[in-house]
């Protein structure tokens, strides 16, 4: 009995000491700097933005890319990396969000971005001279608390100042990796607090002398691999032809890393030249798989009404009737257990200091 009383006394003392420690932490670092998981103040539902591809949203498991996180999209040249990120920008703008594009490659095609649905008039763009400048601009934008999405294109083009000011043949090993490591350490906490999504586009390099395993690696060291909540590997796997003319690419995206849902899922979609990801084609294919769209012979129908003979005609019908396309997409999302399309981007919080 005495042991029980003594145990209860120690427990009460521990609780008192813990309460004092928590109070001290909150006083020093602000309210919300530490909390219990069961308190309900921590956001259980992850806010997402669609990638513009229904199949990829489903493969990500939460209905899109998570906000308040770092995302890396990498792949070979002309695989669709910039197209995919511009589609995400267009989707965020549809929700009323503010987007910024850090064009370190100095290669953004504004006309193409407009064709993909990006409101280029309201897109913030920066073409920094050095890697340090790019990451400082990113940090300032995130800290403002008024930006919903920032794209950095690309990690390979974030050249350290010392390299730009040095001679052409100078050997400066590890400078870019150090720059990325320092920049990401500084950024991650603020990104989470402001609910800003930051997408890094990256390129692939070949490691020399690799006998076993993949010789492929991404630029900028290992920091981004650790800090990224989602890593997407995008590849062109074929061509789409209309007669003899190539009109697009067949694309595969693998979710290589995912901290918000099970990883290693894959998505396949078409990227049409001048149009971007064929959303309507995906809605038809996934709608048929989920038995929401009926297919009889060459005819496609929805709710008992025929929407087109052949996939091209059905795709055209959905392009002309976006409300029906959205309705089918939301039904597919619900059937597969991912979040339906949102309507509001949500106001990010301002960060002090």
From Swiss-Prot:
Query: Where is it localised?
Result: Cytoplasm
Q: Name one GO cellular component term.
A: cytosol
Annotated GO biological process = DNA recombination; DNA repair; SOS response
State one molecular function term (GO): ATP binding
Ligand binding (ATP) = 75-82
Keywords carried by this UniProt record: ATP-binding, Cytoplasm, DNA damage, DNA recombination, DNA repair, DNA-binding, Nucleotide-binding, SOS response
Question: Record's Gene3D superfamilies?
Answer: P-loop containing nucleotide triphosphate hydrolases
Task: Report the protein's function.
Answer: Can catalyze the hydrolysis of ATP in the presence of single-stranded DNA, the ATP-dependent uptake of single-stranded DNA by duplex DNA, and the ATP-dependent hybridization of homologous single-stranded DNAs. It interacts with LexA causing its activation and leading to its autocatalytic cleavage.
Similarity field: Belongs to the RecA family.
Q: HAMAP family from the xrefs?
A: RecA
Query: Per its record, how is this protein called by name?
Result: Protein RecA
Q: Which gene encodes it?
A: recA
């Amino acid at each position: 009995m005495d042991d029980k009383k003594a145990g209860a006394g120690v427990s009460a003392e521990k609780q008192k000491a813990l309460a004092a420690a928590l109070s001290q932490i909150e006083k020093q670092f602000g309210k919300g700097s530490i909390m219990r998981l069961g308190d309900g103040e921590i956001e259980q539902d992850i806010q997402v933005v669609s990638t513009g591809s229904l199949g990829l949203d489903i493969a990500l498991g939460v209905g899109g890319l998570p906000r308040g996180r770092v995302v890396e999209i990498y792949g070979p040249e002309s695989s669709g990396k910039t197209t995919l990120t511009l589609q995400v920008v267009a989707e965020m703008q549809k929700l009323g969000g503010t987007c910024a594009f850090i064009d370190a490659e100095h290669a953004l095609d504004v006309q193409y971005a407009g064709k993909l649905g990006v409101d280029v008039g309201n897109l913030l763009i920066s073409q920094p001279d050095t890697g340090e400048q790019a990451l400082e601009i990113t940090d300032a934008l995130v800290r403002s608390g008024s930006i919903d999405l920032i794209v950095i294109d690309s990690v390979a083009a974030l050249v350290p100042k010392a390299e730009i000011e040095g001679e052409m043949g100078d050997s400066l090993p590890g400078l870019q990796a150090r720059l990325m490591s320092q920049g990401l350490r500084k950024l991650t906490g603020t990104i989470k607090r402001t609910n800003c999504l930051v997408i890094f586009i990256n390129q692939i390099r070949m490691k020399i002398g690799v006998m076993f395993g993949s010789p492929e690696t991404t630029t900028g060291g290992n920091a981004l691999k650790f800090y990224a909540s989602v890593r997407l590997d995008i590849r062109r796997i074929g061509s789409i032809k209309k007669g003899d003319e190539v009109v697009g690419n067949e694309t595969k995206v693998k979710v290589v890393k995912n901290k918000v849902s099970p990883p290693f899922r894959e998505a396949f979609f078409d990227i049409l030249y001048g149009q971007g990801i064929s959303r309507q084609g995906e809605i038809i294919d996934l709608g048929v798989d989920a038995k929401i769209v009926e297919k009889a012979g060459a005819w496609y129908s929805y709710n008992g009404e025929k929407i087109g003979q052949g996939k091209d005609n059905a795709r055209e019908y959905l392009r002309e009737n976006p409300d029906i396309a959205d309705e089918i997409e939301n039904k597919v999302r619900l059937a597969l257990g991912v979040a339906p399309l949102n309507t509001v981007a949500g106001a990010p919080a301002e960060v002090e200091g």
